[in-house]
């Protein structure tokens, strides 16, 4: 059993022009109804207060000097750790000048979690274009978090993206690259590395004693013996054979079009897919509002809603907090599992 309660979750606000503020405010207002774990936002107080007024929400904020103050405040006021970089309130209109604050919020969340002052990092969505315009050089959240983790550990980190929902956990081997580049970038070594990390995290944080991995093919019908592509037999099959030699329960390559119906899903704990959409389409189709983006392979827990900034509905009061709520709940569950395992 745990010797002491977990600290609160650290929630970075994401792009302030998107729906991050909308869904974070909505989630806190439903904290009792949804039995949410304590969390604090890392955001610009003025921008967040302006969004609350814009949405007609009555929210009192508790400006924290220490994250440990969050739990006591959580029942009556929304705990908020103020950014040094201010944000301009501009619902639906991403601004390059907000980039520094977006990056700072992520860095602060990671720092506090690594120090043990937060149980996990929960990130609201960011927009890549304004960040790139400000000099950000990472394809997305996942790669930036890996760099921060690498600085902390003093060695490179391999981040693995998992989409986790109530009916499916799906992991893409390649992530944010054009589909045309996938065959050239796919390697046996990378498939083995991603699968190892997935199996380890399923044991360590998800509490699955003997994880079962279903590994997809790349081509239609998993290549059909080479008739529809060589990668399945030349690249993917050797990876599966290596995983089996290491004692990991892995099978495939499986045709992707028959992997995701209910009887197939019942036979594995995670699907290892070869590219972004092969993993994300079934995950989101099965449970769009309940699926959570989890980054595996980091020295801290990180979850995120599975939607983007949704600039077109920001500030309109129609954004649903379901996916953020699911991300918070999963982050808390993973933190509790890890704490129990280490107790």
From Swiss-Prot:
Its cofactor is Zn(2+); Mg(2+); Co(2+). GO terms for cellular component: cytoplasm. It is an enzyme of class 1 (oxidoreductase). GO terms for biological process: pyridoxal phosphate biosynthetic process; pyridoxine biosynthetic process. InterPro entries: PdxA (IPR037510), PdxA_fam (IPR005255). The keyword Magnesium applies. Homodimer. This is 4-hydroxythreonine-4-phosphate dehydrogenase. It comes from Brucella melitensis biotype 1 (strain ATCC 23456 / CCUG 17765 / NCTC 10094 / 16M). The gene is pdxA.
């Amino acid at each position: 059993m745990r010797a002491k309660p977990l600290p609160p979750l650290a929630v970075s606000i994401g792009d302030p022009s998107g729906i991050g503020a909308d869904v974070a405010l909505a989630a806190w207002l439903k904290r009792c109804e949804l039995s949410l774990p304590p969390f604090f936002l890392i955001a610009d107080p003025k921008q967040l207060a302006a969004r609350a007024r814009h949405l007609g929400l009555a929210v009192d904020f508790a400006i924290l000097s220490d994250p440990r103050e969050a739990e006591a405040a959580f029942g009556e006021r929304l705990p908020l750790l103020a950014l040094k970089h201010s944000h301009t309130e501009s619902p639906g209109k991403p601004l390059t000048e907000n980039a520094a604050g977006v990056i700072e919020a992520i860095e602060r969340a990671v720092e506090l979690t690594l120090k043990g002052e937060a149980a996990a990092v929960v990130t609201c969505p960011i927009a890549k274009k304004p960040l790139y315009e400000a000099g950000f050089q990472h394809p997305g959240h996942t790669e930036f978090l890996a760099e921060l983790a690498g600085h902390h550990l003093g060695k490179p980190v391999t981040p693995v993206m998992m989409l986790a929902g109530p009916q499916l956990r799906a992991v893409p081997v390649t992530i944010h690259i054009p589909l045309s580049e996938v065959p050239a970038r796919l390697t046996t070594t990378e498939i083995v590395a991603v699968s190892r990390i997935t199996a380890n995290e399923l044991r360590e944080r998800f509490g699955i004693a003997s994880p079962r991995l279903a590994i997809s093919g790349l081509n239609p019908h998993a290549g059909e013996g080479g008739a529809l592509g060589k990668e399945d037999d030349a690249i993917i099959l050797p990876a599966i054979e290596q995983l089996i030699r290491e004692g990991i329960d892995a099978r495939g390559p499986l045709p992707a079009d028959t992997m995701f119906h209910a009887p197939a899903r019942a036979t594995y704990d995670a699907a290892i897919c070869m590219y972004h959409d092969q993993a994300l389409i079934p995950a989101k189709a099965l449970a769009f509002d309940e699926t959570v983006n989890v980054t595996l392979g980091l020295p801290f827990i990180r979850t995120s809603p599975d939607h983007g900034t949704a600039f077109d509905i920001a500030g309109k009061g129609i954004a649903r907090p379901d996916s953020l709520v699911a991300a918070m709940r999963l982050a808390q569950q993973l933190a509790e599992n890890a704490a129990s395992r280490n107790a």
